[in-house]
């Protein structure tokens, strides 16, 4: 392991940085490490494991890059993990499929393991106003027309994330209203106010389909989210939040892909029967 010091900062690099960073985390929690997917047949190759500690601010961050492979599948993952007092924060920078066909739902597998890790960690510590619930932050980025298409705006909406900053919601609703209008659909102010979480926009459908970049017909909610970039937040707090129950239904094992949205929408409808 390499150690370097730069004034009020110091760095540890190498695989030993993983052990160093999580040295205060109980072994039972470490065993749930989300990058270990060997039980699913995946192998993880770490390309960067770097701790940056700001000695004056008592901030410690682990910068992590890895490639995770299984047969013909290869995924490149980049994350930062921070300790803020006792709270742990995962900042998901990027997930890119480099090889293999779409449809493996690897994003769900990796995020589910991360949630499980944080939930196990929070169960062994005291949560209070000084030590808040652990979190995951993600930039749900979409760039469908880029050289390497990115569809995070829709993918992460189905993984239990809420908007990180609720002040962005009015602008998001305005874009949604304009998008629907362009496709001949009018929505009332009353109905639009029901859209409060990313999964609400992603789930919307009224029988109209539009072609995505691959020429496939998709429902309006998916078409809209495939063009959006937003910042998401997931917390161990309130495990039965609507967006989390939606994700649980959407990603349930054994459900055909074509039925996922229908199953998840049924969860949303439970809240709006009246």
Where are these regions (language model features)?
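Conserved acetyl-CoA-binding loop-helix of GNAT-fold acetyltransferases
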Residues: 101-128
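Extended, charge-biased low-complexity segments
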Residues: 7-60, 65, 69
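Conserved active-site alpha-helix within GNAT-family acetyltransferase domains
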Residues: 140-168
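Charge-rich, solvent-exposed alpha-helical interaction surfaces
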Residues: 5, 17, 21-24, 28, ...
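Conserved acetyl-CoA binding element of GNAT-fold acetyltransferases
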Residues: 76-79, 86-109, 139, 154
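Intrinsically disordered, low-complexity, charge-dense segments enriched in Lys/Arg
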Residues: 166-274
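Conserved GNAT acetyl-CoA-binding A-motif
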Residues: 125-148
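Short, small-residue-biased leader/transition segments that mark boundaries at the very start
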Residues: 1-2
């Amino acid at each position: 392991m390499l150690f370097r010091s730069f004034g009020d900062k110091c760095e540890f690099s190498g695989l030993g940085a993983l052990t160093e960073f999580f040295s205060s985390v109980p072994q039972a929690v470490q065993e749930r490490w989300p990058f270990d997917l060997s039980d699913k047949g995946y192998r993880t190759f770490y390309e960067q494991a770097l701790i940056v500690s700001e000695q004056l601010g008592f901030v410690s961050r682990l910068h992590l890059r890895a490639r995770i492979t299984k047969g013909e599948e290869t995924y490149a993952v980049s994350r930062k993990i921070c300790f803020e007092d006792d709270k742990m924060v995962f900042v998901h920078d990027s997930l890119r499929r480099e090889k293999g066909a779409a449809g493996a739902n690897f994003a769900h597998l990796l995020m589910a393991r991360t949630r499980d890790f944080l939930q196990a960690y929070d169960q062994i510590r005291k949560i209070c106003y000084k030590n808040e619930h652990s979190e995951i932050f993600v930039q749900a980025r979409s760039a469908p027309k880029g050289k390497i298409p990115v569809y995070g705006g829709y993918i992460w909406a189905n993984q239990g994330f809420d908007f990180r900053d609720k002040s962005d919601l009015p602008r998001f609703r305005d874009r949604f209203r304009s998008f629907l209008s362009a496709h001949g659909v009018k929505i009332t102010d009353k109905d639009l106010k029901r859209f409060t979480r990313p999964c609400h926009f992603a789930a919307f459908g009224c029988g109209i389909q539009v072609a995505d970049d691959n020429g496939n017909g998709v429902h309006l909610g998916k078409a809209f989210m495939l063009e959006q970039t937003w910042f998401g937040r997931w917390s161990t707090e309130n495990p039965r939040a609507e967006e989390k129950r939606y994700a649980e239904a959407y990603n349930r094992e054994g459900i055909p892909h074509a039925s996922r949205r229908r199953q998840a929408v049924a969860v949303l409808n439970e809240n709006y029967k009246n």
